[in-house]
Amino acid sequence: MKCFILAAALVLAFACIAASEPAETENEDLDDLSDLEDEEWLDELEEAAEYLESLREFEESRGYKDYMSKAKDLYKDIKKDKRVKAVMKSSYMKEAKKLYKDNPVRDAYQVYKGVKAGGKLLFG
């Protein structure tokens, strides 16, 4: 009996929600824009989107520079050891170099991780 009452209450609630009118928004003035104003507004949105995209690319390139400088510093440290030749010939370092040549911004972190992993292999 309790399940029946609960099911009926849920059906009634969904029926009320479906039949209700949508609430009016506070941005009613947007509905009254002319076509010219609409185009200007869309142009501004497009410019803002382009600006945000350029910021994202800048952040990626800045991150790339950080990771590459860390990788170079780490590489200089481990290069002093004679065992480095074995690490540099290993497959993961070759793959990291290939990734870097293919897409330096996206895969700089992978290069950094590869060099860091090489240092861990050498020095434990």
Swiss-Prot record:
InterPro entries from the UniProt entry: Latarcin_precursor (IPR018802)
Cellular compartment(s): Secreted
Residue(s) carrying Phenylalanine amide: 123
Keywords: Amidation, Antibiotic, Antimicrobial, Secreted, Signal, Toxin
Keyword Nucleus: no
Superkingdom of source: Eukaryota
A Pfam family that the UniProt record links to this protein: Latarcin
Signal peptide: 1-19
Tissue: Expressed by the venom gland.
MF terms (GO), sorted A to Z: toxin activity
Residue numbers covered by the propeptide annotation in the UniProt entry: 20-62
Keyword match Acetylation: no
GO CC list: extracellular region
Domain notes: The mature peptide may form alpha-helices which disrupt target cell membranes.
Biological function: Insecticidal and antimicrobial peptide. Has insecticidal activity against larvae of flesh fly S.carnaria. Has antibacterial activity against Gram-positive bacterium B.subtilis B-501 (MIC=2.5 uM) and Gram-negative bacterium E.coli DH5alpha (MIC=10 uM).
Family in the record: Belongs to the cationic peptide 06 (cytoinsectotoxin) family.
Protein name: Cytoinsectotoxin-4
Organism field: Lachesana tarabaevi (Spider)
